From Swiss-Prot:
One of its GO terms (biological process) is DNA-templated transcription. It is an enzyme of class 2 (transferase). GO terms for cellular component: cytoplasm; DNA-directed RNA polymerase complex. The gene is rpo3. It catalyses: RNA(n) + a ribonucleoside 5'-triphosphate = RNA(n+1) + diphosphate. Its EC number is 2.7.7.6. It comes from Pyrococcus furiosus (strain ATCC 43587 / DSM 3638 / JCM 8422 / Vc1). This is DNA-directed RNA polymerase subunit Rpo3. Its main location: cytoplasm. Keywords: Cytoplasm, DNA-directed RNA polymerase, Nucleotidyltransferase, Transcription, Transferase. DNA-dependent RNA polymerase (RNAP) catalyzes the transcription of DNA into RNA using the four ribonucleoside triphosphates as substrates. Pfam families: RNA_pol_A_bac, RNA_pol_L. It comes from the Archaea.
Amino acid sequence: MAGIEVQILEKKEDSIKFVLKGVHVSFANALRRTILGEVPTFAVDEVEFYENDSALFDEIIAHRLAMIPLTTPVDRFELDALELDDYTVTLSLEAEGPGIVYSGDLKSDDPDVKPVNPNIPIVKLAEGQRLVFNAYAKLGRGKDHAKWQPGFVYYKYYTIVHISKSIPEWKELKKLAKKRGLPVEETEEEVLVTTIKPFYIPKDFEEYEGKEIWEEIVPNTYIFTVETNGELPVEEIVSIALKILMRKADRFISELQKLTS
């Protein structure tokens, strides 16, 4: 992966935005698809009900349980491996109404695998209603079901908006770009705005678009935004995805060499 550059633009607890330089669009899309479909997390896969007097069918409750994000310990599992660890965690519940059953009421037999948010409502129980079940969580991948997706990811082309100083009110656009927190450079003839965030041209300037105002796409450079559901730290999601990509490439090269030898 020589020649690749990464510049972090913004880092929050649940998201990261970075510039990826020196790669073809096919690699950028492969990274996006790997994050969504290949990075494994824990999620409820099966539920065994013993009692359910609630207003919801077993299937509906099971679906709600499956979509609750569960913490996934990075240090205990080889998440970048191409074969997943066959490990099951049991989350049990025994509740009686009246009241609302929340994700925090689930009791896990593994303290490292538990609901990310304890305040997700599952079902409301009326007086005398009971809900008893065991939910079994295992590692899986988003390509098999969305419940295993670690988060959300998208990318856009890295572009530079050129604004000619022949426009009478060009300073207004420069001021607007700075207000948006966008990098602004200036030459004798034009203003250059790097769109690390959206930059919308006001209607008053639409007549200049395409000539005095035009957008340059910087080759092989993309702005990624990755958000986590909470199962994994956001930087780990990107790191694991890159390792999986490299492992897949190594396996492909190995199989190709077998065919040509």
